[in-house]
Amino acid sequence: MPVRIYALAKELNLDSKELVDVVKKAGITGKGSALASLSDEEAQQVRGHLAGSAAKSEPKPKAAPPTKDTPTAPVAPVRDLSGATGRKPSAINVGRPSKPAEAADNPNAPAQPIRDGGRPVGKPAPIVRTPKLAPAPEAKAPEAPAADGSPKPEIRLPKTGGVGTGMASPSGRGIGMGAKTDGQSTKPESAASAPSVPGPKSDSGGRKAPESPKRESAPVASSDDDGSSNKGGGLASRIAGRMGNNSSGRVVPNTPGTPLSAVRRDSASAGGKMRSLDRSRNRPEEAAKAGDAGKSKKREPRIKVNLAQLPSAPAKPAAPTGSSGPAAQKPDIKLTRDVIEGHKQGMKAPLARLEQDEADKKQRSKKTAEGTVGLAGRGKRVIDEDEKPKKKGLAGMASARAERQRGGGGRRIVGSDGGDRHHYRRSRPRIRRKGVNTAAPRKEKVQIELPCTVRNFCEGSGLSVADVMRTLMGMGMMVNINADIDFETAELLATEHDLDIELKAAESLEQELITEIEETADDPDTLVARPPVVTFLGHVDHGKTSLLDHLVGINVVKGEAGGITQHIRAYKIDKDGRAVTFVDTPGHEAFTEMRARGANVTDIAVLVVAADDGIMPQTEEAISHAKAAEVPIVVALNKIDLEGVDANRVMTQLTEHQLTPSEWGGDVEIVRTSATQGTGMDELLDTLLTIAELNEYSANPNRSALGVCLESEQQGDRGVVAKLIVQNGTLRVGDILVCGPAHGRVRAMQDTLTGKPITEAGPSTPVSLMGLDTPPGAGDRFHVLKDISQAREIASAREGESSRQSLSGITTKVSFDSFQEMLEDGKLGESADTVKLNLIIRADARGSLEAIDKELSKFDHPEVEIRVLQRSVGGISLADATLASASDAVILGFNVIPDDKARSLAEERGVEIRRYDVIYKLTDDIRALIEGRLKPEERVVELGRALVKQVFSISRVGTIAGCYVAQGSIQRNCRIRVNRDGRTIGDYQLDTLRRIKEDVKEVPRGMECGIRLQGFNDIKQDDVLEAYKIEEVARKLD
């Protein structure tokens, strides 16, 4: 049956902590607490270990055969204590008699109750110390325990204060029978052959007591025969003493002629007076009162020293002595990797921890030994004779309070006579918390999913919230514990705090499905040749669309508003039995995103450069897009038929942009073309097909389709129409499609060039697709899935993310310097005086919306805030007019018209609707709208100067200044600055201007007039009046 360690400790009369250490030494691991359970086998193993330890430290003494013919050693005379106490000394029965007959021969010995080990139960019998005297050969014992030639018995007494023996203190400082006095070792005789010898009488008895020689303090611990120090208070000795084995102490037998040394019971006071062993153990002051009252009436015990041989435990085998073999060595303990890693995390090394534990144990043992004086039993104190009487203490609760204040508030033990014997308190172990992380290191990296909050990051990384918040504030981020942190911020935190963590984004259905589709590698056996995708890039009005019209055989230029391309187009044509896909991009500055999309989906980029203009800003942008896409570049030098063009100048400019012509040893092919006359068209087409053959473009038509959305629009009769280009696989009618925030099933597809319906589209094929729920974003990738619910979930997640970004608003960044300026000016917390321009934008395609947004981003002004309330694809509806009326917004329509309801509501409520078909016209009107909402600029215009010649005072009117206009003119409603003695003393509004008696609008130079100022009558002669006016001038964004 399992047993707790503390229950086994009570059974073995041990301390629970000591038994825990014994369990560890016995080889039983995982039992570091007194509440741990031990099985029957483990308990038996612990008992066997304790028995083995006791047998090893206490060897069984050799039995001495008793002989009557052997003379005994002389016994030293015992000091007579009757003079001090008035009572006769009693004998102390140390140990138990070797034979029952020997105990019966002593009729004066008091009856002792016998326990299981043969030890007397009750109070420990006091031991009488005898002075060192000269040997008395005439005092012969009738019996001798051993012959002269026989080996002397070795008797060990327990060194710990047991219940029945009382021979030593728990701290190991009690003196056993084998203690040395004056450098001589005492050798006692057996109890049967040592009769009590009366000590010398006192002076009152007629005999002079011999003078005790001065004794020096002997060492407390006894020495073994081999000279090795056996320290008192050892674990095996204490266990043997508490388990009933009385053979722990050792007494060296006397040799003939050597006197018996004094038996000591005091701990460290070796040179004090002899204690009275028969008086009650009261306080010193109470003992003095009892001595004055008279002698004690209690029965005095008869003291007798019985030095009988103490047999060892019968069930324990004799263990070899310490000198019989080499000293035991500790096993080599190799440090594991976990321990080494734990040391790096703040854990102490095993050796350092063991040394610290040993030092703490020695320190506690030392403190216990210093605070314990002559303990005969646990918690009982023996008061020496020479102790000075203490001061009279306080009574009642005051005494207890004072005791607690000086640290003596322990448990109080009351003696049999009602007096306090000893105050002691059990010291509790003090727990010191150290700020060191003692957790074992992780065996693998911590994974943190992003985005996460600051709290989640701290819990995952093991950092405190205060440290993370302090680091984020140091980075200039004012966040709270629930704020989200992105991937970059988490990386900065990990670097700052030296964390070895793995950051990963949360797994979603999109990542699971879309990533699998994108990363699926095609089998080389399934790849077939596909048509190349050729994109025309260049500056506006350089002839891109004209070149494409000549190659394709159509005329798109005439249908474009303003003669410029404002939409991206894609066509697939067959030329000499070989298919080529062409993509036309706008060249206007506003269509940067369209050019970037065209460069990303292309295989070959055709850079169209006008021979008369050369490299222009949008040409440089197109070069950067093509280089970023890492595609071959072919330069079409257009308009070569114009007079005065210099092809070498254009090629020099291309070389400056790292495009070296093949004619000059580079790798860029330059084809001279003319779209109007058709010059160089065949050469350009052959060059493109040759480059396609060299690169061997291929795709797998048997897999699910994926590609890019080039453009999307909302049509009234067909709904959402998306222009897609298939990059890999085959797209069929009925496929489930997800493209950005849009999803749906393919209902119909049309050819982009002819408009004919088609049922499937292979690689490098542009199509117009119907069936999506909303217009997808231009540039979004599309994928074909197997389940409509998965497509709906992915599209919904994308739409939610887009909504969160749009609703997040714009956070104004305030630097510390601007914050200080606002604080000093008292403008902190005040809203800026800005004018808001609300817009509702409707366009025919997603690409047009992107172009308009790009143009609006140019008009960033601190006094005007442009807010786009809604942007969408399709015509202007009644809801748009209602929203514009409620928010005082302007509706901008690009290539769309309002319906009848929207037009009538706009006329009724005064909503402004502006329609455009060319992007730069829309840009000019938006600029005018913004400039019209700017505050006009005030300019000061100087008009003239007048000198005050004479001053007239009229009671009802005021002071009139007669002036002479010396410069310029004085006009009505102007302002006047009054200058006197070279400085301006005031600035006032002109109230009245008269010439003779008539009010006039203006007085020219050289004329005299009368001037009256508003609110100022202190005009004096010789003052100078300066006339000026403030004009408001409309401001420009430039």
From Swiss-Prot:
List cellular component terms (GO): cytoplasm; cytosol
Ranges for the region named G1 are 538-545
Q: Where does GTP bind?
A: 538-545, 584-588, 638-641
Q: Where along the chain is composition biased (Low complexity)?
A: 65-77, 100-113, 131-147, 311-328
Q: Where is this region: G3?
A: 584-587
Cysteine disulfide links: none
Q: Does the keyword Transcription apply?
A: no
Q: Where is this region: G4?
A: 638-641
Region annotation (G2) ranges:
563-567
Residue ranges constituting the tr-type G domain according to the UniProt record: 529-696
Q: Which UniProt keywords apply?
A: Cytoplasm, GTP-binding, Initiation factor, Nucleotide-binding, Protein biosynthesis
Region named G5: 674-676
Compositional bias of kind Basic and acidic residues: 204-217, 275-295, 331-344
Kindly list the places in or outside the cell where this protein is found, as annotated in its UniProt entry. Answer: Cytoplasm
Q: Where is this region: Disordered?
A: 32-442
Query: Which residue intervals are annotated with compositional bias (Basic residues) in the record?
Result: 422-435
User: What molecular functions are annotated in GO for this chain?
Assistant: GTP binding; GTPase activity; translation initiation factor activity
> Per its database record, what is this protein's job?
One of the essential components for the initiation of protein synthesis. Protects formylmethionyl-tRNA from spontaneous hydrolysis and promotes its binding to the 30S ribosomal subunits. Also involved in the hydrolysis of GTP during the formation of the 70S ribosomal complex.
Q: Which PANTHER family match?
A: TR-TYPE G DOMAIN-CONTAINING PROTEIN, TRANSLATION INITIATION FACTOR IF-2-RELATED
Say which family it is in: Belongs to the TRAFAC class translation factor GTPase superfamily. Classic translation factor GTPase family. IF-2 subfamily.
Q: What is this protein called?
A: Translation initiation factor IF-2
State the organism named in the record.
Answer: Rhodopirellula baltica (strain DSM 10527 / NCIMB 13988 / SH1)
